């Protein structure tokens, strides 16, 4: 069969176009309302994490930089202590935790909803390490967040901090409780209580620097990030929210059909109303609040982009600063993203033109790590 030059050129163009639009490792490849490319790079498969988000992963979905191919191991903690003072450092922290792999903590204190916690300690962990709590999206797991969003542990390898990966409790559809009064209240007896217990355990037993404790998460994990900053502002110095909603916005823990009004971006409140929802999480608290960094894409079909502005209103009100940005930086940290700073850097927002729900985009995690000072 002989092809005409014009047809041959067309075939070559199609091949080039398909190659250009193939989704790289950990990129979004599907989900309800998603209109971007769905074909993964060679050797990758499109893995459904929930109705709203599918991600390109390797066939075995194995973490690319771990030092072991073994599944997560479980260790028993040392006997609990009644003091909150950190131990005197006599060597590398957390000697009972294997370095360079994901390790499950079997017990870490008060855990009323039976969440699971996993720890990643890098080989070069600092003697006085920082701590990052990383919370998976709805439909995900701690292992999936560890493998599918590798930037956090890669930066832990480079900077020597410890990462705690939370996992939502059994029977939760792998979603965090972001609506109950118990979870939205300090020591209320739900998911937020268990996460805080794990942080307190790390502070008591691993020589973690209390000035370098941070929280981050995607989607449902982003919502829980906001909740942790609201319920335990004395534990966390800052949070980074990837595709989330304001505290007290959603009325259900799992995606709804038709969408919850908050999902659709139709829940609009005043800064004072949003701020009050944070303040109610810890009545009487008058200390400093965590700095907050908020990321959202304009093509997020799971949680409307309008939720970025509502979160900004909430946290600027909590910090008692203006809702007018002090600076705007286009093409930051990359083309298509716009950064806005509020007050003296207490709140930052990043709006991604054309970005979907699968945040963080690979390579943008470093901006959050720098914001934290890890």
From Swiss-Prot:
Give the record's GO CC terms: extracellular region
Q: GO molecular function of the protein, one example?
A: cellulose binding
Major location category of this protein: secreted
**PTM note:** Glycosylated.
Gene source species: Coprinopsis cinerea (strain Okayama-7 / 130 / ATCC MYA-4618 / FGSC 9003)
The biased composition feature labelled Low complexity covers 63-73
One Pfam family name is CBM_1
Secretion signal: which residues? 1-22
Keyword list, A-Z = Carbohydrate metabolism, Cellulose degradation, Glycoprotein, Hydrolase, Polysaccharide degradation, Secreted, Serine esterase, Signal
List the protein's name. Answer: Acetylxylan esterase
Pathway membership, UniProt: Glycan degradation; xylan degradation
